[in-house]
Amino acid sequence: ANLHLAYIFLFFYLSLNIFIHELGHIKSLNYIGKKHQKIGFKMNYYIFPAIYVEMNEIYLISKNEKIIVHLAGLITNYLTINFIQVINLLFLKNKILDSSFIFFSYALLWNLVPVLNSDGYKVLITLFSVDELENKRKNHLIVKLIQAISLLLVIETVISWFV
């Protein structure tokens, strides 16, 4: 029973953090005076489920503003999970909440790694002023390298499911 409760709690904790993450992107874009087009669901590389915010107007803002928008989801998550964890440590002392904090902390770090269309990837291509929508053959070497590494990660993940 406790294990089922832990999974249910982790699901709600994860759902809350996904919502807050995407809201961070939306609100930072709004602060700059731009709007998002939609919130959607997709399968990165046809395997990894992802919720995203379509932000076409991001191409109309400065490099620094783009970086802020791309990092805003991670920053709001970081602040949220640390606030919840401080409350937990001071008052609740809940082990499931401790585990959820650790799990999501790793997820935040993973999102900083510039692969699989992550926020870290978006920040990196912005720093290098790379237009990811350009013709694939004209893509910057860094984009091709990231795409190759991402593809290797996808292949390794799928293989690990069956081995």
Spell out what each predicted region is.
Residues 1-163:
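Hydrophobic transmembrane alpha-helices and their immediate loop junctions
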